[in-house]
Amino acid sequence: MLSVRIPLAPITNPQQLQLSPLKGLSLVDKENTPPALSGARVLASKTARRIFQEPAEPKTKAAAPGVEDEPLLRENPRRFVIFPIEYHDIWQMYKKAEASFWTAEEVDLSKDIQHWESLKPEERYFISHVLAFFAASDGIVNENLVERFSQEVQITEARCFYGFQIAMENIHSEMYSLLIDTYIKDPKEREFLFNAIETMPCVEKKADWALRWIGDKEATYGERVVAFAAVEGIFFSGSFASIFWLKKRGLMPGLTFSNELISRDEGLHCDFACLMFKHLVHKPSEERVREIIINAVRVEQEFLTEALPVKLIGMNCTLMKQYIEFVADRLMLELGFSKVFRVENPFDFMENISLEGKTNFFEKRVGEYQRMGVMSSPTENSFTLDADF
């Protein structure tokens, strides 16, 4: 039976035109839109609103000096398609991140409660405050990735990595929030820890340091890459070491295992920042990089030796200061510059764990997790009948 097409009735009511889902739809400020086309942003967090003071009337800004000379930042009309791969080293970093995907549900916290209750009050105080810092800091890293880096960088391989990093930072933040939720039973104390950026001056100081870099309209991409390499490579290093110290004592297996997973991820994120820095044509001077790194070291040393001293869990504050300097030197080397502090690693238990640039977690496969087949070449998974036996 032939179908009969009924002609559309003419539109007599002008209001019917407003029913179209495309009416008034703007493609500005959507995913993969270059920053120059972005409209007014609705900022997700109070801290971001505090940093970003956008003008009431948007003004057309000229491209930042050097953007057209930077292959990473130059507008790329092929950014919507992944293949063919142009930056193979950046793509391999993305595949490493993809191979190491994990979720908070994989971490067993059942034994931690008994350990937590047996800890001294000062040890519980230290751990809870470190977790509060971690829970907030991953959100700040994501604020930077969403607001700045993902919009500025135009090469597809790096955008893939940043997208996956955002997902992993969300998992880290969920893991830390879950740890606080598991250990802290008092609702008021729990709320205090979840709002650490506003309730703890020591955490607020570190957060403000990072947030200032997100909101700095004058700083170059290269300077901000160094700053956030410092956030993930220096600001996290001392706290990671303090939790690994608990592992050395045989305490808190769930906390320490999640710390292994997260520190491995952050090591990779730090390595990626260094790789992006190496791809820049116009890099900040060594003097400027040293200034940023030294400033980050001072903030972290104050955090773990004065504001929240590691002596609360039995660690030596002087050695912790030295360890932070050691990590900073490794970061300077990975960025292609000379060491600043020239000190040895004072913590033997961190020898294979420190965020040293060339992450050795993939060789050691910490926690025995890596997605099967993700790092394999296509030919490795093919079936043949002519193999040698």
Swiss-Prot record:
The modification Phosphoserine is found at residue 20. The active site is at residue 176. SUPFAM superfamilies: Ferritin-like (SSF47240). Its EC number is 1.17.4.1. GO terms for cellular component: cytosol; nucleus. It is found in: Cytoplasm; Nucleus. CDD domains: RNRR2. The keyword Iron applies. It is an enzyme of class 1 (oxidoreductase). Binds 2 iron ions per subunit. It comes from the Eukaryota. Phosphorylation on Ser-20 relieves the inhibitory effect on Wnt signaling. Phosphorylated on Thr-33 by CDK1 and CDK2; predominantly in G2 and M phase. Ubiquitinated by the SCF(CCNF) E3 ubiquitin-protein ligase complex; leading to its degradation by the proteasome. The keyword Ubl conjugation applies. One of its GO terms (biological process) is deoxyribonucleotide biosynthetic process. GO terms for molecular function: metal ion binding; ribonucleoside-diphosphate reductase activity, thioredoxin disulfide as acceptor. Keywords: Cytoplasm, Deoxyribonucleotide synthesis, Iron, Metal-binding, Nucleus, Oxidoreductase, Phosphoprotein, Ubl conjugation. Gene3D superfamilies: Ribonucleotide Reductase, subunit A. It catalyses: a 2'-deoxyribonucleoside 5'-diphosphate + [thioredoxin]-disulfide + H2O = a ribonucleoside 5'-diphosphate + [thioredoxin]-dithiol. The modification Phosphothreonine is found at residue 33. Fe cation 1 binds at residues 138, 169, 172. Provides the precursors necessary for DNA synthesis. Catalyzes the biosynthesis of deoxyribonucleotides from the corresponding ribonucleotides. Inhibits Wnt signaling. Two distinct regulatory sites have been defined: the specificity site, which controls substrate specificity, and the activity site which regulates overall catalytic activity. A substrate-binding catalytic site, located on M1, is formed only in the presence of the second subunit M2. Heterodimer of a large and a small subunit. Interacts (via Cy motif and when phosphorylated at Thr-33) with CCNF; the interaction occurs exclusively in G2 and early M. This is Ribonucleoside-diphosphate reductase subunit M2. The lineage of its organism: Eukaryota, Metazoa, Chordata, Craniata, Vertebrata.
